[in-house]
Amino acid sequence: MSLEQLVTINDLNVDIGKQLIKIARDSIKNRFKLVNLNLDEYKNPVLNKRGLAFVTIEKIEDERTSLRGCIGYVEAVAPLKEIVSKAAVAAAFSDPRFPPLSKSELNDILIEVTILTKPEEISVKDRWKLPSFINVGEDGLIVEYGIMYSGLLLPQVASEYCWDSETFLAETCIKAGLKPDCWLNERVKIKKFNGLIYREINKNTDEIIVLRPSDIKCKKSQHSNLQ
């Protein structure tokens, strides 16, 4: 697949973000038979290009939010609108860290869609220099070892926890089920990617905010699960 076939950050704008958020929320509501979802209605050419995306669901509790689900896809196997729809349903009902979302929770959640660039492997002979190749606030990370171990952390996670690049590497290793220093092993693949974030402000309107990971403020005390 050529890069030209993939959605890029430069393809995106606020209107596309609003449509992606609506697709995500309506995909969840469709499971409860509250709406009839028809992805064919979304004609924007960008939405019909292949894309990579994660959907994060946060639950509002006592004026704070906590993670309620986060699932995504780093293989561009379908149009962006389909990837976001599938990721939203998976985040709501198939994240193994949480019970399936209930109908009663629909009014207490906010949805975030992160569009990813194509992951690229970081190639460096001296593994101790790996942290210097990672830009916290811009890069997300993937750790892969063989076919059994894989872990991904979105770029905004490092910003939210105020991590440095070495801590980010260690936490991604842990997410993959490996030791924190796995990134020093030459057989472990380290990939990085960028992302653009669309976040609901209010579930009752189509108003959203567009964020770069570097815009995210540290709020580590509010998190109990990693994305």
Swiss-Prot record:
Superkingdom in the source lineage: Archaea
Any Pfam family matching the protein: AMMECR1
PROSITE patterns attached to this UniProt entry: AMMECR1 (PS51112)
SUPFAM superfamilies: AMMECR1-like
Residue ranges of domain AMMECR1 in the record: 15-209
InterPro entries associated with the record: AMMECR1, AMMECR1_dom_sf, AMMECR1_domain, AMMECR1_N, AmmeMemoSam_A, Uncharacterised_MJ0810
Family annotation (HAMAP family): AMMECR1 (MF_00645)
Protein name: Protein Saci_0792
Annotated organism of origin: Sulfolobus acidocaldarius (strain ATCC 33909 / DSM 639 / JCM 8929 / NBRC 15157 / NCIMB 11770)
